[in-house]
From Swiss-Prot:
The protein's name: tRNA N6-adenosine threonylcarbamoyltransferase
Transmembrane regions: none
Top-level taxonomic group: Bacteria
UniProt function note: Required for the formation of a threonylcarbamoyl group on adenosine at position 37 (t(6)A37) in tRNAs that read codons beginning with adenine. Is involved in the transfer of the threonylcarbamoyl moiety of threonylcarbamoyl-AMP (TC-AMP) to the N6 group of A37, together with TsaE and TsaB. TsaD likely plays a direct catalytic role in this reaction.
Gene3D superfamilies, per database record: 3.30.420.40
Protein's organism: Mycobacterium sp. (strain JLS)
Protein family according to the UniProt entry: Belongs to the KAE1 / TsaD family.
Protein residues bound to Fe cation: H113, H117, D302
Gene name tied to this protein: tsaD
Length: 340
Protein backbone atom coordinates (compact mmCIF):
# COMPACT_ATOMS: atom_id res chain seq x y z
CA UNK A 1 0.00 0.00 0.00
CA UNK A 2 1.38 3.40 -1.02
CA UNK A 3 0.60 6.30 1.31
CA UNK A 4 1.10 9.93 0.30
CA UNK A 5 1.05 12.42 3.17
CA UNK A 6 1.03 16.21 3.46
CA UNK A 7 2.40 18.22 6.39
CA UNK A 8 1.49 21.92 6.68
CA UNK A 9 0.99 22.65 10.37
CA UNK A 10 3.49 25.52 10.62
CA UNK A 11 6.21 26.85 8.29
CA UNK A 12 7.33 23.66 6.52
CA UNK A 13 5.49 22.29 3.51
CA UNK A 14 6.18 18.57 3.52
CA UNK A 15 5.14 15.73 1.24
CA UNK A 16 6.15 12.21 2.20
CA UNK A 17 5.46 8.92 0.46
CA UNK A 18 5.77 5.58 2.23
CA UNK A 19 4.96 1.97 1.49
CA UNK A 20 3.11 -0.19 4.02
CA UNK A 21 3.92 -3.86 3.46
CA UNK A 22 1.66 -6.77 4.39
CA UNK A 23 3.90 -7.59 7.36
CA UNK A 24 3.49 -4.05 8.73
CA UNK A 25 6.88 -2.76 7.61
CA UNK A 26 6.90 0.92 6.66
CA UNK A 27 9.43 1.99 4.01
CA UNK A 28 10.15 5.60 3.10
CA UNK A 29 10.00 6.29 -0.64
CA UNK A 30 10.15 10.09 -0.73
CA UNK A 31 10.53 12.98 1.70
CA UNK A 32 10.35 16.46 0.18
CA UNK A 33 10.21 19.64 2.26
CA UNK A 34 9.97 23.34 1.37
CA UNK A 35 10.51 25.80 4.22
CA UNK A 36 9.35 29.39 4.54
CA UNK A 37 11.51 30.02 7.62
CA UNK A 38 13.55 32.74 5.89
CA UNK A 39 10.38 34.71 5.21
CA UNK A 40 9.51 34.65 8.92
CA UNK A 41 13.00 35.40 10.22
CA UNK A 42 12.77 39.16 9.68
CA UNK A 43 9.66 39.23 11.88
CA UNK A 44 11.30 37.26 14.69
CA UNK A 45 8.80 34.41 14.51
CA UNK A 46 6.22 32.64 12.39
CA UNK A 47 3.59 34.91 10.81
CA UNK A 48 0.48 32.76 10.21
CA UNK A 49 -0.66 34.51 7.02
CA UNK A 50 2.79 34.27 5.46
CA UNK A 51 2.93 30.59 6.38
CA UNK A 52 -0.43 29.90 4.72
CA UNK A 53 0.53 31.74 1.53
CA UNK A 54 3.86 29.91 1.41
CA UNK A 55 2.08 26.56 1.64
CA UNK A 56 -0.16 27.52 -1.28
CA UNK A 57 2.88 28.37 -3.40
CA UNK A 58 5.06 25.42 -2.38
CA UNK A 59 2.64 22.51 -2.19
CA UNK A 60 2.30 21.81 -5.92
CA UNK A 61 6.05 21.75 -6.71
CA UNK A 62 6.80 19.79 -3.52
CA UNK A 63 4.14 17.24 -4.45
CA UNK A 64 5.61 16.81 -7.93
CA UNK A 65 9.11 16.29 -6.55
CA UNK A 66 7.88 13.65 -4.10
CA UNK A 67 5.93 11.73 -6.75
CA UNK A 68 8.91 11.82 -9.12
CA UNK A 69 11.33 10.68 -6.41
CA UNK A 70 9.09 7.79 -5.38
CA UNK A 71 8.25 6.85 -8.95
CA UNK A 72 4.58 6.79 -8.01
CA UNK A 73 1.65 7.87 -10.15
CA UNK A 74 -1.34 7.30 -7.91
CA UNK A 75 -1.12 6.36 -4.21
CA UNK A 76 -3.54 4.04 -2.41
CA UNK A 77 -4.14 6.48 0.45
CA UNK A 78 -3.77 10.22 1.00
CA UNK A 79 -3.08 11.51 4.52
CA UNK A 80 -2.54 14.95 6.00
CA UNK A 81 -1.81 16.65 9.29
CA UNK A 82 -5.25 17.70 10.52
CA UNK A 83 -3.99 19.24 13.78
CA UNK A 84 -2.60 20.68 15.93
CA UNK A 85 -1.06 23.71 14.25
CA UNK A 86 -1.80 27.09 12.70
CA UNK A 87 -5.40 27.24 11.50
CA UNK A 88 -4.73 28.69 8.05
CA UNK A 89 -1.68 26.54 7.43
CA UNK A 90 -3.58 23.37 8.32
CA UNK A 91 -6.43 24.32 6.00
CA UNK A 92 -4.10 24.47 3.00
CA UNK A 93 -2.72 20.99 3.53
CA UNK A 94 -6.01 19.38 4.49
CA UNK A 95 -7.90 20.93 1.57
CA UNK A 96 -5.22 19.75 -0.85
CA UNK A 97 -5.21 16.24 0.61
CA UNK A 98 -8.99 15.99 0.34
CA UNK A 99 -8.87 17.18 -3.26
CA UNK A 100 -6.23 14.59 -4.18
CA UNK A 101 -8.23 11.93 -2.32
CA UNK A 102 -11.37 12.75 -4.28
CA UNK A 103 -9.58 13.04 -7.62
CA UNK A 104 -7.72 9.74 -7.19
CA UNK A 105 -10.73 8.11 -5.49
CA UNK A 106 -8.65 6.83 -2.59
CA UNK A 107 -9.24 7.05 1.20
CA UNK A 108 -8.28 10.15 3.18
CA UNK A 109 -6.74 10.03 6.66
CA UNK A 110 -6.52 13.19 8.77
CA UNK A 111 -3.92 12.42 11.44
CA UNK A 112 -2.27 14.04 14.43
CA UNK A 113 0.92 16.00 13.81
CA UNK A 114 2.33 15.03 17.21
CA UNK A 115 1.81 11.33 16.59
CA UNK A 116 3.69 11.85 13.36
CA UNK A 117 6.76 13.04 15.25
CA UNK A 118 6.76 9.80 17.23
CA UNK A 119 6.27 7.68 14.12
CA UNK A 120 9.22 9.27 12.27
CA UNK A 121 11.65 7.17 14.28
CA UNK A 122 10.43 3.95 12.65
CA UNK A 123 12.32 4.81 9.46
CA UNK A 124 15.62 4.77 11.35
CA UNK A 125 15.12 2.09 13.99
CA UNK A 126 12.30 -0.19 12.87
CA UNK A 127 9.09 -1.13 14.72
CA UNK A 128 8.55 0.81 17.93
CA UNK A 129 8.13 -1.26 21.12
CA UNK A 130 6.20 0.02 24.12
CA UNK A 131 7.93 3.28 25.01
CA UNK A 132 7.91 6.46 27.00
CA UNK A 133 7.86 9.28 24.49
CA UNK A 134 9.40 12.68 25.16
CA UNK A 135 7.96 14.99 22.53
CA UNK A 136 9.69 18.37 22.43
CA UNK A 137 9.14 21.06 19.81
CA UNK A 138 8.54 24.76 19.34
CA UNK A 139 4.95 24.52 20.51
CA UNK A 140 4.77 21.33 22.53
CA UNK A 141 6.46 19.52 25.39
CA UNK A 142 4.85 16.24 26.43
CA UNK A 143 5.73 13.04 28.27
CA UNK A 144 3.76 10.18 26.75
CA UNK A 145 3.13 6.48 27.22
CA UNK A 146 3.18 4.89 23.77
CA UNK A 147 2.01 1.28 23.92
CA UNK A 148 2.15 1.11 20.13
CA UNK A 149 1.73 3.61 17.32
CA UNK A 150 -1.60 2.05 16.40
CA UNK A 151 -3.11 2.50 19.87
CA UNK A 152 -4.27 5.68 21.62
CA UNK A 153 -1.37 7.63 23.12
CA UNK A 154 -1.52 8.31 26.86
CA UNK A 155 -0.33 11.68 28.12
CA UNK A 156 1.66 11.52 31.35
CA UNK A 157 2.45 15.22 31.59
CA UNK A 158 3.16 18.39 29.64
CA UNK A 159 4.42 21.93 30.07
CA UNK A 160 2.38 24.26 32.24
CA UNK A 161 3.63 27.33 30.36
CA UNK A 162 6.27 27.64 27.61
CA UNK A 163 7.28 24.72 25.42
CA UNK A 164 10.99 23.86 25.39
CA UNK A 165 11.42 25.03 21.80
CA UNK A 166 9.59 28.26 22.54
CA UNK A 167 12.04 28.94 25.38
CA UNK A 168 14.93 28.35 22.97
CA UNK A 169 13.58 30.90 20.52
CA UNK A 170 12.95 33.48 23.24
CA UNK A 171 16.41 33.12 24.77
CA UNK A 172 18.03 33.25 21.33
CA UNK A 173 16.16 36.49 20.65
CA UNK A 174 17.28 37.80 24.04
CA UNK A 175 20.90 37.11 23.07
CA UNK A 176 20.45 38.73 19.66
CA UNK A 177 20.85 35.47 17.77
CA UNK A 178 17.79 35.89 15.56
CA UNK A 179 15.06 33.44 14.58
CA UNK A 180 14.83 30.49 14.55
CA UNK A 181 16.98 30.15 17.62
CA UNK A 182 17.38 26.42 18.20
CA UNK A 183 20.38 25.52 16.07
CA UNK A 184 22.27 28.80 16.43
CA UNK A 185 21.90 28.69 20.22
CA UNK A 186 23.02 25.05 20.23
CA UNK A 187 26.10 25.96 18.19
CA UNK A 188 26.92 28.86 20.52
CA UNK A 189 26.43 26.71 23.63
CA UNK A 190 29.07 24.24 22.44
CA UNK A 191 31.62 27.04 22.74
CA UNK A 192 30.66 27.82 26.34
CA UNK A 193 31.05 26.32 29.80
CA UNK A 194 27.78 24.70 30.83
CA UNK A 195 28.82 24.78 34.51
CA UNK A 196 29.78 28.47 34.57
CA UNK A 197 26.20 29.70 35.09
CA UNK A 198 23.66 27.48 36.84
CA UNK A 199 20.10 28.39 35.94
CA UNK A 200 17.02 27.09 37.82
CA UNK A 201 15.34 23.82 36.94
CA UNK A 202 11.58 24.34 36.98
CA UNK A 203 9.10 21.79 38.36
CA UNK A 204 11.80 19.63 39.96
CA UNK A 205 10.89 20.08 43.63
CA UNK A 206 9.65 17.20 45.82
CA UNK A 207 6.07 18.50 45.69
CA UNK A 208 6.02 19.20 41.95
CA UNK A 209 4.35 16.96 39.40
CA UNK A 210 7.16 14.57 38.36
CA UNK A 211 5.95 14.50 34.76
CA UNK A 212 5.13 18.20 34.24
CA UNK A 213 7.44 20.88 32.84
CA UNK A 214 7.88 24.64 33.21
CA UNK A 215 10.30 26.78 31.23
CA UNK A 216 8.88 30.27 31.81
CA UNK A 217 10.87 30.77 35.00
CA UNK A 218 14.06 29.64 33.29
CA UNK A 219 13.51 32.12 30.48
CA UNK A 220 12.98 34.91 33.03
CA UNK A 221 16.10 33.89 34.96
CA UNK A 222 18.20 34.10 31.80
CA UNK A 223 16.76 37.54 30.99
CA UNK A 224 17.55 38.85 34.48
CA UNK A 225 21.05 37.41 34.40
CA UNK A 226 21.85 38.99 31.04
CA UNK A 227 20.50 42.33 32.26
CA UNK A 228 22.54 42.26 35.47
CA UNK A 229 25.70 40.78 33.92
CA UNK A 230 26.19 42.63 30.60
CA UNK A 231 29.82 41.48 30.50
CA UNK A 232 28.90 37.78 30.71
CA UNK A 233 29.98 35.42 27.96
CA UNK A 234 27.08 34.75 25.62
CA UNK A 235 28.43 31.26 25.03
CA UNK A 236 28.35 30.53 28.77
CA UNK A 237 24.80 31.90 29.05
CA UNK A 238 23.70 29.72 26.13
CA UNK A 239 25.46 26.67 27.58
CA UNK A 240 23.95 27.20 31.03
CA UNK A 241 20.47 27.62 29.59
CA UNK A 242 20.81 24.58 27.34
CA UNK A 243 22.09 22.45 30.22
CA UNK A 244 19.07 23.39 32.35
CA UNK A 245 16.64 22.41 29.59
CA UNK A 246 18.38 19.13 28.74
CA UNK A 247 18.76 18.24 32.42
CA UNK A 248 15.06 18.62 33.20
CA UNK A 249 13.86 16.92 30.02
CA UNK A 250 16.06 13.86 30.35
CA UNK A 251 15.69 13.53 34.11
CA UNK A 252 11.90 13.45 33.93
CA UNK A 253 11.81 11.22 30.85
CA UNK A 254 14.06 8.58 32.42
CA UNK A 255 12.05 8.74 35.64
CA UNK A 256 8.82 8.18 33.70
CA UNK A 257 10.26 5.11 31.98
CA UNK A 258 11.45 3.69 35.30
CA UNK A 259 8.08 4.42 36.95
CA UNK A 260 6.14 2.65 34.19
CA UNK A 261 8.62 -0.20 33.90
CA UNK A 262 9.17 0.58 30.22
CA UNK A 263 12.60 -0.17 28.76
CA UNK A 264 12.58 2.18 25.75
CA UNK A 265 12.71 5.98 25.68
CA UNK A 266 11.79 7.73 22.43
CA UNK A 267 12.66 11.41 22.01
CA UNK A 268 11.03 13.20 19.09
CA UNK A 269 10.17 16.66 17.78
CA UNK A 270 12.28 19.56 16.61
CA UNK A 271 14.17 20.01 19.89
CA UNK A 272 15.26 16.35 19.67
CA UNK A 273 17.84 17.55 17.12
CA UNK A 274 19.64 19.43 19.93
CA UNK A 275 23.15 18.07 20.48
CA UNK A 276 23.24 18.38 24.28
CA UNK A 277 19.80 16.80 24.71
CA UNK A 278 20.88 13.83 22.60
CA UNK A 279 24.18 13.52 24.47
CA UNK A 280 22.67 13.70 27.97
CA UNK A 281 19.80 11.38 27.04
CA UNK A 282 22.28 8.79 25.78
CA UNK A 283 24.28 9.06 29.00
CA UNK A 284 21.29 8.79 31.33
CA UNK A 285 19.62 5.99 29.39
CA UNK A 286 22.85 4.00 29.53
CA UNK A 287 23.04 4.51 33.30
CA UNK A 288 19.40 3.44 33.70
CA UNK A 289 19.64 0.47 31.34
CA UNK A 290 17.15 1.97 28.88
CA UNK A 291 17.15 1.76 25.10
CA UNK A 292 17.22 5.26 23.59
CA UNK A 293 15.65 6.01 20.23
CA UNK A 294 15.97 9.41 18.54
CA UNK A 295 15.38 9.98 14.80
CA UNK A 296 18.09 11.53 12.65
CA UNK A 297 17.93 15.36 12.87
CA UNK A 298 16.16 15.76 9.50
CA UNK A 299 13.29 13.58 10.72
CA UNK A 300 13.03 15.50 14.00
CA UNK A 301 11.76 18.64 12.28
CA UNK A 302 8.40 18.86 10.48
CA UNK A 303 8.08 16.73 7.35
CA UNK A 304 5.56 14.71 5.37
CA UNK A 305 7.42 11.43 5.89
CA UNK A 306 6.45 11.31 9.54
CA UNK A 307 2.77 11.81 8.68
CA UNK A 308 2.94 8.98 6.16
CA UNK A 309 4.48 6.73 8.82
CA UNK A 310 1.83 7.55 11.42
CA UNK A 311 -0.98 7.06 8.92
CA UNK A 312 0.53 3.70 7.95
CA UNK A 313 0.52 2.51 11.56
CA UNK A 314 -3.08 3.62 12.08
CA UNK A 315 -4.13 1.82 8.89
CA UNK A 316 -2.28 -1.33 9.95
CA UNK A 317 -4.15 -1.19 13.26
CA UNK A 318 -7.50 -1.06 11.45
CA UNK A 319 -8.33 2.64 11.81
CA UNK A 320 -11.10 3.80 9.47
CA UNK A 321 -10.57 6.62 6.94
CA UNK A 322 -11.55 10.15 7.86
CA UNK A 323 -14.65 11.56 6.16
CA UNK A 324 -14.02 14.29 3.62
CA UNK A 325 -16.13 16.52 5.89
CA UNK A 326 -13.56 16.18 8.70
CA UNK A 327 -12.39 19.62 9.82
CA UNK A 328 -8.86 20.56 10.76
CA UNK A 329 -8.37 21.16 14.48
CA UNK A 330 -5.64 23.66 15.50
CA UNK A 331 -5.92 22.47 19.11
CA UNK A 332 -6.08 18.73 18.48
CA UNK A 333 -4.80 16.99 21.65
CA UNK A 334 -2.02 14.45 21.44
CA UNK A 335 -4.33 11.70 22.72
CA UNK A 336 -6.46 11.90 19.53
CA UNK A 337 -4.51 10.09 16.83
CA UNK A 338 -6.80 11.12 14.00
CA UNK A 339 -10.05 12.87 13.12
CA UNK A 340 -12.39 10.15 11.90
Amino acid sequence: MIILAIESSCDETGVGIAELSEDGTVTLLADEVASSVDEHARFGGVVPEIASRAHLEALGPTMRRALDTAGVGRPDVVAATIGPGLAGALLVGVAAAKAYSAAWQVPFYGVNHLGGHLAADVYDHGPLPESVGLLVSGGHTHLLHVRSLGEPIIELGSTVDDAAGEAYDKVARLLGLGYPGGKVLDDLARQGDREAIVFPRGMTGPRDDPFAFSFSGLKTAVARYVESHPEASQADVAAGFQEAVADVLTRKAVRAAETLGVSTLLIAGGVAANSRLRELAEQRCAEAGLTLRIPRPRLCTDNGAMIASFAAHLIAAGAPPSPLEAASDPGLPVVRSQVA
